[in-house]
Amino acid sequence: MTKPPRTYRTLDARPSGDSLIKPGELVDVVEVTPLTLADRRIYNLLLENAWDAIDKPVTHVIAKTLLRGSHNSNDRIGASVERLMSAIVKVEVVWDGEPAIERVQLLGGNIETLRSDGLLEYEIPSRLRKIIRNSTVFARLQREVMFALTSKYALTLYEMVQKRGNLRWRASDRFTLEELRGILGVPKGKLTSWSNLKLRAIEPAVAEVNQLSDYVVEIAPIKTGRRVTHVELRWWKKDGEGQGAAERELASSRVGREQRRKEAEAEADGLKPRPAWLDAKGASLQTTTYETARLRFPGYDIYFVEAEWRAWAATREAPRDADAAFLAFFRTYAERHPL
């Protein structure tokens, strides 16, 4: 009789000198207190340090020098630990036969010696140990990429893609805007409009992940009526040439890397073609009109605003000069939706 296939557990995966393992349940984390880039890096290092006994009821010890990175002060370590203690992960579970949500702290009790070259002793909460023990999906994070990414949004997006990249028959995932804000750790009251979220968080994160990781990533808006309510995250593995380019970027200086990314973004902005789905909404405007809009209203998605204009104009009399009408609408739109 054929044996059933063995379920591969996250705990079976082993970290290496170049990479570390993060259970998938700890990637899409909803933060009560927004975490910083340093917090996220430190937490990944704490998980790696505890990995061999991470599902056991034991304490773990790590040298603070391993958590400081290039920062010379221990103050940041203590602040990061406290924020991690207040962060939670929400996991969908079944309780007494009913769907339920389990909420678990990311980090348990700990003690930190005050010496700059001292130690941090910490615990993994019992409920979290159980979640990790039962985990079957994980992200393998390249250490070099983790330390090269310059924003918490980029690191979070990288983890999201690494968690999903090896899933069979799946190359996209959908989130509400609120879900995405929660996972990215956007502070409450910040980046509340789609245009702000896209410009300040999503686009820079996508650009960094595309530049430095093994995957190409896209985040596309999905509208309900006239509002963007969801996004679709898409990913695909780079070919050999693309992976080689990412490795060369990682080997280059950060200053040069940032400059090349900005140049690539500027070139993409100038050459970005009109999406095909807009053809169904009306004929293309003059090329000079799009260029004028790009120069007058930098940072806005020109074609998204065109779609908004066409939806608004659909119930009105056709303008005599569509190009002038679009630019007038764009001016009003920018005033009402500042970046």
List each language-model region with its residue ranges:
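Charged, alpha-helix-forming regions
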Residues: 1-279, 286-292, 307, 311-339
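Short, mixed-charge amphipathic alpha-helical segments
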Residues: 291-300
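Intrinsically disordered, low-complexity Ser/Thr/Pro-enriched regulatory regions
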Residues: 303-304
